[in-house]
Amino acid sequence: MCIRDRLKLVFEDYEADSGDKAVNAYNTLKDQGMQIFLGTVTTGSCLAVVDKSKQDNIFQFTPSASAQDVIANDNCFQICFTDPNQGKASADYIADNKVATKIGVIYDSSDAYSSGIYNAFKTEAAAKGLELVSEQSFTKDSKTDFSAQIADCKNKGAELVFLPIYHQQASLILTQSKNAGFAPKFFGCDGLDGLTSIKNFDTSLAEGVMLLTPFAADSKDQATQDFVKAYKAAYNDETPNQFAADAYDGVKILAKLIESQKITGDMSASDICEKLKAGITAADFSYDGLTGTGLKWNANGEVSKSPKAVVIKDGNYAALDN
């Protein structure tokens, strides 16, 4: 029997919550007999359940929770690259390609993902000689009105605003920046993926926005083209973003490991966890997927993966030339 016939995906919506809803969703999955945990999508919710999956010794494989604390336990591995790597890579790209020298930053101080990238970016920016002229924060309780943050960046002459945040808040910042007559360059990370798909957002404001992402839907390789075609057919012609691609790679990686480790459904979740940990860190294991080739994992749960720099052009991603 083919491996896909032996995999049963069960979903619970935790509503991007970093508290009780995330824990309740995890407990519901566990009560339904979960043997492998492919989750969560966001960092805050992942941090809410990592100790529970460790206590249960269930293998946890997160597609896109990128904080280093997510993989503090030995049962959790990331498909995405870590926040420090994104922050460092962003500062390096901006400095090495002379994109700008005077930088403003707007980040979510209440979010581990955003704060982690910001802290790494700040450290590397200093090492690269970039000037952070404005460092502005907001929290989960104040994420709709960005007029003060935008005004500070504008008044201090920011040539580029770095946005280590998610696309929902980025769309508001772009809209409010236009209304304030502020038109700097904007640069973000994988959280900006999906910016052009937000309902009721003037996507023309996203033109020229730069970001680092492991996946670009307009890539010409056959695997990406096949995935995009199938995804659009399944989801009302919606273009997949890196969140979808990371999750897809996650399922394929697990399938490969299940085969190589000879894992069967009658094994306990704990036994499966031990086999998956051994398999994914084995010297001879690697994976070529949508979000990178030759992917390998260390015992700390980190994946070796390099982000791609892209710019939004005509509503699509285009590779940024180095």
Q: What does each model-identified segment do?
A:
Residues 1-322:
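Extracytosolic ligand-binding ectodomains
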